[in-house]
């Protein structure tokens, strides 16, 4: 099924910026888009400039190799024929491959000790979107019609775990000395768990992927306000980076925006009816985190390491946070059900 058959097209933009403080950009991003297909990746490296840059590049290259080859050879039928489950498996396998490459690279070079990266990505096919995620970069769904924003991914950070357990508030988390510490990232160990999410998109929806250089300075409702104020993803992405930099730009900042448009509304409705959609958000299959581990300091200093073992059990499917629903794996998708998201004022 080609893009004309679905009645959908995607408009996209991708930007990354060093920020106002850092000398190097350890973020790597990638965006491939054609008609109603897109693959977007944000990876935020850590462990020092050279190590972080290399780790995030490895993550991006591994995923590109997994899914772009068929498209580069014009094999759209292959991409259309792939099941969502197969796509998810390919993306997860690519992340695990990248993780092993990073671990091996660090073990072979003492100067790269502590290297690692986050990775957040989405593969879009028409109105289908499949996300895979490790770390604290984020994916958001912004509903243009009803003006709300939903955080799709869960941060794998120490402070978010403390918030979820009721030990600290969101406000305290923003000032916590361990706010930059992750309990899961590529490069920590040979094995890695990957979160997988699936949702359906509608015309007018925007997907936004970003590194924490954006969310450190810009609140979710502000992100949505900027994105919805401009129909051009390129201008919206530029405005978000400018806003983050105007507020200090303490970290590298990366933004990818994907806007869903209906080129043939009637054809789109026919395809959606035929697909018998149920707007379901699929949360990670293994919701219990037994232990939290990381070798990453608040300053990304590989010599200043932290290991957090067996702090508490955490049910990942019930992480409440700004702009993110806290429903069970069978709950209606918050993006279209009216629950659990930041709503913007009209106008």
Where are these regions (language model features)?
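PP2C/PPM-type serine/threonine phosphatase catalytic domain
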Residues: 1-347
């Amino acid at each position: 099924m080609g893009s004309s058959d679905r009645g959908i097209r995607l408009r996209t933009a991708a930007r990354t910026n060093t920020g106002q403080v850092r000398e190097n950009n350890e973020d790597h991003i990638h965006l491939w888009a054609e008609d109603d297909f897109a693959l977007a990746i944000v990876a935020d490296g850590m462990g020092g400039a050279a190590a972080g840059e290399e780790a995030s590049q490895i993550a991006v290259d591994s995923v590109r190799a997994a899914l772009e080859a068929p498209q580069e050879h014009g094999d759209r039928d292959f991409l259309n024929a792939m099941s969502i489950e197969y796509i998810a498996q390919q993306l997860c396998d690519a992340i695990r491959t990248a993780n092993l490459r990073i671990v091996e690279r660090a073990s072979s070079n003492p100067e790269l000790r502590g290297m690692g990266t986050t990775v957040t990505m989405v593969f879009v096919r028409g109105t289908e979107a499949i996300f895979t995620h490790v770390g604290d970069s984020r994916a958001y769904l912004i509903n243009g019609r009803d003006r709300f924003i939903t955080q799709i991914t869960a941060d794998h950070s120490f402070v978010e775990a403390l918030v979820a357990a009721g030990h600290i508030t969101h406000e305290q988390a923003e000032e916590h000395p361990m706010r930059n510490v992750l309990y899961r990232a590529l490069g920590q160990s040979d094995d890695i768990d990957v979160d997988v999410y699936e949702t359906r998109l509608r015309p007018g929806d925007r997907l936004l992927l970003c590194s924490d250089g954006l969310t450190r300075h810009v609140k979710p409702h502000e992100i949505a306000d900027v994105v919805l104020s401009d129909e051009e993803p390129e201008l919206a992405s530029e405005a978000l980076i400018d806003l983050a930099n105007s507020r200090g730009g303490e970290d590298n900042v990366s933004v990818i925006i994907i806007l869903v448009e209906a080129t043939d509304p009637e054809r789109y409705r026919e395809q959606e009816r035929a697909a018998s959609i149920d707007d379901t958000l699929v949360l990670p299959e293994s919701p219990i985190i037994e232990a939290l581990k990381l070798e990453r300091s608040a300053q990304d200093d590989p010599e200043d390491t932290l290991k957090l073992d067996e702090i508490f059990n955490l049910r990942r499917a019930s992480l409440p946070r700004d702009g993110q629903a806290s429903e069970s794996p069978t709950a209606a998708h918050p993006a279209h059900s009216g629950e659990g998201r930041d709503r913007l004022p009209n106008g």
